[in-house]
Amino acid sequence: MNHSAPGNADKHGESLAARFAEAPHIAASTTDERRFESWLAELEPAQSARLEALLVQPFGRNILVGIAEFSPYLFDLVRADPLRLIRLLECDPDTHLAALIAEARGAVLAAPDEAEVMRLLRRMKAEAALLTALCDIGGVWPVMRVTSALTDVAVSSVQAALQYLLRQEAARGKLFPPNPEAPEEGCGLIVLAMGKMGAGELNYSSDIDLIVFFDPDATTLAPDIEPQPFFVRVTQGMARILQQRTYDGYVFRVDLRLRPDPSSTQVAISRDAALHYYEREGRTWERAAMIKARACAGDARAGEALLAEIAPFVWRKHLDFAALADVHDMKRQMQTYRGQSEVAVEGHNVKVGRGGIREIEFFAQTQQLIAGGRHPELRVRPTLAALDVLASSNWITLAARDELARAYEFLRRVEHRLQMVADEQTHALPDDREAVERFARFFGYPDREAFARDLLRQLEIVQGHYEKLFEGDDPTGTAKLPALDYSAGPDDPRLFQHLTTLGFKKPAAVAQTVRDWITGDYRVFRNEATRSAFIEFVPALIDGLALAEEPDRAVVAFDQFLGALQRGGRLITLLGQNRDLVALVALVLGAAPRLGEMLARQPQLMDGLIDPRFFGAMPDRRELSGRLAATVQDAASYEEFLDRLRLFGQESLFLIGTRILSGTVSAQQASTAFADVAEGVVHTVHDLVADRFAAQHGRIKGQETAIIAMGRLGSREMTASSDLDLILLYDFDSENPDSDGPKSLQGAHYFARFTQRLISAFTTRTNYGVLYEIDMRLRPSGRAGPVASSLASFADYQANEAWTWEHMALTRARVVSASAEFGERIAGVIRDVLTRRRDPATIANDVADMRRAIAQEKGETDYWDLKYAAGGMIDIDFIAQYLQLVHAHHKPDILDVSTLQVLDNAARLGVLPQSEAEILRAAARLYHDLTQILRLCVSDRFKPETAGTDLQRVMARAGDAPDFSSLEARVKETQSEVRRVFRALLEGTSPASAR
């Protein structure tokens, strides 16, 4: 029997009885079978005949006999109303449930008094309870459809009760709803469904967890009505309607204790008090609870607004591994309280016991808490949906997702069957074997042993995954390391021997450094909790640093890093929970001090290294845009928006840089990634500044603005230190030059002010530094020209005034932010300029003159100045630009913003000999590879004699050389070859120069 089967829900149109796919296991000739048969015989003949006709279907009789034998509660429902049972067996269950809920809501609206409301809701609940039980026991609905049906009944019941009460209050003149038919709209009362109700996963006999808030400033109350007493009374009335036991039973037990500080607060809490509590006192378990929170009744708009305001409490901006320990402590306390520390069968609690439902929920919720702030896609309510997203985002494996999902569905069915026995919110199996035997047969198993095998297998699978997340990796890192006194220093022979065994060449110096960490006066350790956490982490840290290519240098680099670190509690926790990153961080600190300084200033940059996507494929522009949008979407102010943009930019630089150092991306991939990040940031800033500027100054009729990327951003060849070369172009209806805002500006002045505002968004120094340095000297007339140009003046300048070097720069021009139509117009202007007929000799002379001028200004004798050295990258760029300007008129396919692509195009079109193209392509790739490393690791000129061996090793690997001296020889030889080609093309008589 498959107890996590998908159900028989797809056979729409057939009766429920015809869709049964499984049933309890009935032993031959039981007393309870005779009990069922005698009840059947007592029915009126017409009812008995209809029922017998339905029970000829497979499984139907065994389901009802099983109910009679194992579930007093369900058999009471069966006997109470035979016609109801017949109606259910004849119905399509999905259609019937929807109609049942709708009819009850309609009847409540017309109910004359509260007693009738209570009777209507209880009868709806009883019929829904029997229907969902039949669908669950008979395998008609998968278990999560059952939970969703139960949730639909609960939500509708809460809404109906609340709506009735608000209509009564309106009739008394205490409430003035804009829409009397829907008094909840705009009333300011918010009912949040929590837990399984919030996630649409309600169990069979569940309480419903609700929190009630109200917004006293946004109600429809009469002027003389105090909000809190009013809403407390309404909340109490709602709970009474739902849970008070009457002749017809109850609807749902209501639990209001998940509200802030329930022992000292009223059952309805003001919005401001709630926000203040969550901001100041909210605990991790309350954050976890809020993952599933959903506005289910009352003022829906106010509910969604409140959840948005609570979101920063739930979803932290940075990875939150502290939640891991908090949630695990909570779980241990529950197990201790309930005595559920081992997997078992008899007496085992399938909810909070080892391997139970709660461990699956905590497994998902904890990882949602850790990463949901950075990854909004993880903010889903249902447990199975959370497992799906965790798997698709690579936080867990697909195998783990599948195993946990199967276990979850199995255990939820066990839980339901336990609760169906007596309509009790129980989660524990019976304490004796005989009772478990009976339960197993109710669940469809032939005996206890068959059930126990399946149960224990699922519990052990869950326990294994849970322990791997919370316990198995030993967060302190000390389980597998020798018990040593790391504060003993170099005089301890055991520590000395251990460090030697790990591969440290200077164990005494390392031992002294470690003692300094533990006992010294580092700023980061002035917080005693941080020092204690670090001391626990030291064994794992030393183990990780020993894996670096040069362990002794890694220790020195980490020591310097600790000295620069202002605050580091989170960083120590992150490294402690992710010990495999220690060696990578050591590489970063040793080879790229610039990145180390960034990490010391902003320890949260580590978050990206822990993201499972870090070592996957580089994100494309679309994915980056999504991440950027998620980063800034809920910024509370313009200043916070700027901070988040800067943090996004710095983290992106740090992550791409780390991947360059670790050799997991090529230089070309890194160039593209840097450009994609910059382009996304430019587009985001452009849109936001435009909207803010328009709010103040309005818009001009027909206005368009565009940002053109030049230089390295234009060619998508950026490095970690590239600034942004930008030009801003605009257009508008010249006959209507005034903007329509409260502070109107005219024409060119409007766009000049807008451009200055745009530059400020990039260059203003905030707590997170500068976003990008902006260079606009490539605009028409350079520094002498206006900061923004109209498209018409730009086109005229390029056609009639621009110098050759400006047209060379234009070969890299690319529109990165504009409307599609305006962007195409600009691209057309650029294309027209570049495809003009030009004299090859004149262009060659201009390019050669410019190269000589740059050499005079910058020098060209330092062969490690890969850009300006004779035969360096400038030579290759100038060759590519020369070839485009000379040949684009009759071979427009040569045009491209990328130097490498231009060289490919030129060779393919026959305007550059293949041999020379190959020399230039190989050189460009080498220079790109090395330049990415140097821009990342060196802030000034590169000097081999002072470069550390970590950096030399990384450079040799990037240059595909066996060692650094071989790399030097290759660089010199390459520059000689490139300079030869440059002279042949631009200073000599090569056929390519005039072809």
UniProtKB/Swiss-Prot annotation:
UniProt keywords, alphabetically: ATP-binding, Magnesium, Multifunctional enzyme, Nucleotide-binding, Nucleotidyltransferase, Transferase
Job of this protein: Involved in the regulation of glutamine synthetase GlnA, a key enzyme in the process to assimilate ammonia. When cellular nitrogen levels are high, the C-terminal adenylyl transferase (AT) inactivates GlnA by covalent transfer of an adenylyl group from ATP to specific tyrosine residue of GlnA, thus reducing its activity. Conversely, when nitrogen levels are low, the N-terminal adenylyl removase (AR) activates GlnA by removing the adenylyl group by phosphorolysis, increasing its activity.
InterPro entries: GlnE, GlnE_rpt_dom, NT_sf, PII_UdlTrfase/GS_AdlTrfase
Gene, per the UniProt record: glnE
Record-linked NCBIfam families: PRK11072.1 (NF008292), PRK14108.1 (NF010706)
Name of this chain's protein: Bifunctional glutamine synthetase adenylyltransferase/adenylyl-removing enzyme
Source organism of the structure: Bradyrhizobium diazoefficiens (strain JCM 10833 / BCRC 13528 / IAM 13628 / NBRC 14792 / USDA 110)
Catalyzed reactions: [glutamine synthetase]-O(4)-(5'-adenylyl)-L-tyrosine + phosphate = [glutamine synthetase]-L-tyrosine + ADP; [glutamine synthetase]-L-tyrosine + ATP = [glutamine synthetase]-O(4)-(5'-adenylyl)-L-tyrosine + diphosphate
EC number: 2.7.7.89, 2.7.7.42
Lineage, broadest ranks: Bacteria, Pseudomonadati, Pseudomonadota, Alphaproteobacteria, Hyphomicrobiales
GO MF annotations in UniProt: [glutamate-ammonia-ligase] adenylyltransferase activity; [glutamine synthetase]-adenylyl-L-tyrosine phosphorylase activity; ATP binding; magnesium ion binding
